[in-house]
């Protein structure tokens, strides 16, 4: 049975949505959750029926969102530190946290270690697309200052991930740039372009719009660019839906039309862009599975993050990454 260490104290809303998400996940899938945090508080929120279905590891400290990620290594009694240690010590297969993302990534990288041939891990996320499948973008925040070699490794990891997780054969990998021509880009992307040509699925430079139009399956960028893209996209989605609501309220025919489209159109659209459907972002390149969830995650997001951790662990994606990069040496 897959064992998942879950930081029960991380997140903006405390342990309640996390425990609720664990309960929802247990109702649908078989796995062993290990809740790390204040045992008394966890037990007070856990329904009686599920008490014997979880393990609890006591942690007396919580790393707040305002704390420095660099201090995470010193906070050995924190819930996220102890959760990561369970994976390091092979007592769990995966770790999940909606807490301090910087601390989670730091601890996962330094305590769990990196896969062979990986110099830096990358945070990966799936973006909605007009194509048959969603588009994987990496890095979206783990490494702000990248080398060309980092970007090459990101491309290889992304290729392996979508093959194993999304079952896409011969995935197309693009390098995010300011134009699709081979000559476009800055010093970093131009050097990375040469390295990425060694990947069988590399199709060249892509523009921001190509993330969403189905042109490629994987988009590679540095964490600084990727994080800006991710947050800008979230803002666009929020704005578009709010504008739609405003215009619908101003017109009776629009209200009637919206009512007719509510279930089959709007509900499906919302599902495509709802971050809670994705649950969290895997930190690719670490020796194990680490899922970083949004601080504002609700129970649905936590449930889906757990499902993502289960799928990641079962897929053997890390072995695929190692194999792919060892072939290129």
Swiss-Prot record:
The keyword Iron-sulfur does not apply. The keyword Manganese does not apply. Its main location: cytoplasm. Pathway: Lipid metabolism; phospholipid metabolism. One of its GO terms (molecular function) is phosphate:acyl-[acyl carrier protein] acyltransferase activity. It catalyses: a fatty acyl-[ACP] + phosphate = an acyl phosphate + holo-[ACP]. Keywords: Cytoplasm, Lipid biosynthesis, Lipid metabolism, Phospholipid biosynthesis, Phospholipid metabolism, Transferase. InterPro entries: FA_synthesis, Phospholipid_synth_PlsX-like. One of its GO terms (cellular component) is cytoplasm. One of its GO terms (biological process) is fatty acid biosynthetic process. Its EC number is 2.3.1.274. Coiled coil: none annotated. Pfam families: FA_synthesis (PF02504). It is found in: Cytoplasm. Homodimer. Probably interacts with PlsY. Catalyzes the reversible formation of acyl-phosphate (acyl-PO(4)) from acyl-[acyl-carrier-protein] (acyl-ACP). This enzyme utilizes acyl-ACP as fatty acyl donor, but not acyl-CoA. Belongs to the PlsX family. This is Phosphate acyltransferase. It comes from Sulfurovum sp. (strain NBC37-1).
